[in-house]
Regions:
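Structured extracytoplasmic
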Residues: 9-167, 175-182, 186-198, 206-213, ...
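N-terminal signal peptide c-region/cleavage motif recognized by signal peptidases
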Residues: 3-4
Length: 255
């Protein structure tokens, strides 16, 4: 076995890989803010038998409003909103439009905001020991696959860190652009309320211009509030109809 073959067999340098992934994420963020989308969310409440006891859906439109993103509810359970709720949404939009216009007059610029949280942020990799487990093809693109287990010698200082140290990670990092294309975090140890099996997974889609956008997120909650009974809920969020908008909120193109 040659030296180069042996190096490849060991996989990529994980520390360098995370540095490149962090830089790719930073470079992608302003480009991602230029995109709007349509969002479809399915929420399932699961009973003790593992059956769906309550299912409902919501459809949202992310629109450009005074130069930034605004999420507008347009359907509930695959049907148009009832008249009363539609009026409430219209009133919310009117008030938000007025608020943003006042901010503009005052010289305050609203950045785009994302409404989701993954329970894992940049820098949290320091709580895990990672190993390279191979390669997989994600949406036709080769990706490095890493698995992370919580470090045994780290003591948490807050609830977020406690959650991390009760979880396992799996990451897919694009080999060409070093962007984190897929991600999974699953709770494996019992905390105060969150139970093992609680999970968040998301997938990213690459646009023609090289921008990466989240197009699917799966969340499974297994909670035991007040230590009384398990509450289980599954949420699937998909995004589609991505399109750019300008600072003046005019739609430019669809992909």
């Amino acid at each position: 076995m040659t030296a180069s073959t042996a190096l490849w067999a060991q996989g990529p340098n994980i520390e360098e890989l995370f540095k490149k992934a962090g830089a790719a994420s930073d470079a992608n963020e302003p480009k991602a803010r230029q995109y709007l989308y349509r969002e479809y969310k399915v929420t399932n409440e699961i009973n003790e038998k593992g059956e769906s006891s309550n299912r409902h859906t919501e459809t949202w439109e992310a629109i450009g409003l005074e130069g930034s993103e605004y999420r507008k509810l347009v359907q509930r359970d695959d049907k148009p909103l009832r008249e009363k709720e539609q009026k409430q949404e219209d009133e919310k939009l009117r008030k938000e439009t007025d608020r943003r216009r006042q901010e503009k007059k005052g010289g305050i610029k609203n950045p785009l905001k994302r409404s989701y949280s993954f329970g894992y942020t940049k820098g949290d990799e320091r709580f895990f020991d990672f190993r390279y487990v191979g390669e997989e093809v994600v949406n036709g693109r080769p990706a490095y696959v890493l698995e992370g287990k919580p470090k045994s010698d780290v003591k948490p200082t807050n609830n977020h860190e406690k959650q991390l140290l009760l979880s396992r990670l799996k990451l897919w990092i694009d080999e060409e652009e070093f962007f984190e294309s897929n991600f999974e975090i699953e709770v494996t140890g019992a905390g105060v309320d969150i139970r093992p099996g609680t999970m968040v997974a998301f997938k990213q889609q690459r646009m023609e211009d090289g921008t990466w956008l989240m197009n699917e997120m799966r969340v499974r909650f297994i909670l035991k509030p007040l230590r009384i009974a398990n509450v289980r809920m599954e949420v699937l969020t998909t995004r589609s109809d991505f399109h750019k908008f300008a600072v003046d909120s005019r739609i430019l193109e669809r992909q």
